[in-house]
C-alpha cells in the first residue's frame, strides 16, 4: 500500500511538472520573457536614480535611498522569472510568487513615502540643481511604480496558471447560455408533432362536417 501511494504521488508530481513545463515553455513563454526583461530593466534603471537622489539630498547617505529596495527585489524577481522560463520547476513558481508579492508591497510603500516626501518637501526654488533633483525623484518614483504594476501583472498571470482559474464565471455563464439554447430547441421539436396532430384533427373534423352536409336528413 505504501509503495502504491508513493507511486501515485510520484505520478501526480510528474503530471504537475509536465503541465508546468507546457505552461512556461509554450503557452506563456512570451509573457514570462516580457515580464523578466521588464523587471530587470526597471531595476537597473531605478538603482542609479536612487543613488543619484541620495547623493544630491544628503551627501550619498544610502539610508535615504528607499528605491534601492524595490530595485534589488526587482533584480531577484526578474532572475527567478527567467529561470522559470528556462527550466520550469514547481519551487520556482512559489519563489516567483513570493518575490512578486514582496516587490509589490515594498514598491507600493516606497512610492507612497517618496511621493509624500516630494509633496511635503521645501518650496521649489529657481535653481537648476533643485529642478534636476525633482526630475530624478519623479523618475525614480515612476520607475518604482512601473515595477509595482509589473509585479501585479505577474501575480495575475500566476493566478491563471491552473485551468479555469479567474474564468470559471464566464465559462459557467457560457454553459448556461448553451443550456438555454438547447432548451429553446427542444420545445420546437416537441411542438412540431403537436401542430401536425392539431392540423390532422381539423381536417378530419372538416371531412365529417362535409359528409354530414351531403347526407340526406
Curated annotation (Swiss-Prot):
Name of the featured protein: Transmembrane protein 253
Gene name as annotated: TMEM253
Main location (coarse class): membrane
Keywords (A to Z) from UniProt: Membrane, Transmembrane, Transmembrane helix
Membrane-crossing segments per the record: 33-53, 62-82, 96-116, 138-158
Superkingdom of the source species: Eukaryota
Annotated membrane topology: Multi-pass membrane protein
InterPro entries in alphabetical order: TMEM253
Keyword Membrane included in the entry's annotation: yes
Gene Ontology CC: membrane
Compartments it resides in: Membrane
Annotated region (Disordered), positions in chain: 187-217
Amino acid at each position: 500500500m505504501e509503495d502504491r501511494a508513493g507511486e501515485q504521488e510520484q505520478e501526480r508530481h510528474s503530471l504537475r511538472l509536465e503541465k508546468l513545463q507546457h505552461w512556461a515553455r509554450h503557452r506563456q513563454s512570451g509573457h514570462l520573457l516580457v515580464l523578466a526583461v521588464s523587471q530587470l530593466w526597471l531595476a537597473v534603471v531605478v538603482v542609479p536614480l536612487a543613488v543619484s537622489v541620495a547623493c544630491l539630498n544628503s551627501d550619498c547617505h544610502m539610508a535615504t535611498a528607499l528605491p534601492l529596495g524595490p530595485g534589488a527585489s526587482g533584480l531577484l524577481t526578474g532572475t527567478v522569472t527567467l529561470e522559470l522560463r528556462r527550466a520550469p520547476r514547481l519551487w520556482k513558481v512559489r519563489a516567483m510568487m513570493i518575490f512578486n508579492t514582496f516587490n509589490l508591497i515594498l514598491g507600493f510603500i516606497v512610492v507612497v513615502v517618496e511621493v509624500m516626501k516630494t509633496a511635503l518637501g521645501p518650496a521649489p526654488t529657481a535653481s537648476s540643481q533643485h529642478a534636476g533633483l525633482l526630475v530624478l525623484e519623479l523618475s525614480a518614483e515612476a520607475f518604482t511604480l512601473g515595477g509595482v504594476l509589473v509585479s501585479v501583472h505577474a501575480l495575475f498571470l500566476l493566478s491563471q496558471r491552473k485551468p479555469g482559474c479567474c474564468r470559471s464565471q464566464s465559462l459557467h455563464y457560457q454553459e448556461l447560455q448553451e443550456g438555454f439554447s438547447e432548451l429553446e430547441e427542444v420545445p420546437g421539436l416537441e411542438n412540431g408533432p403537436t401542430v401536425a396532430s392539431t392540423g390532422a384533427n381539423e381536417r378530419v373534423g372538416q371531412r365529417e362536417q362535409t359528409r354530414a352536409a351531403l347526407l340526406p336528413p
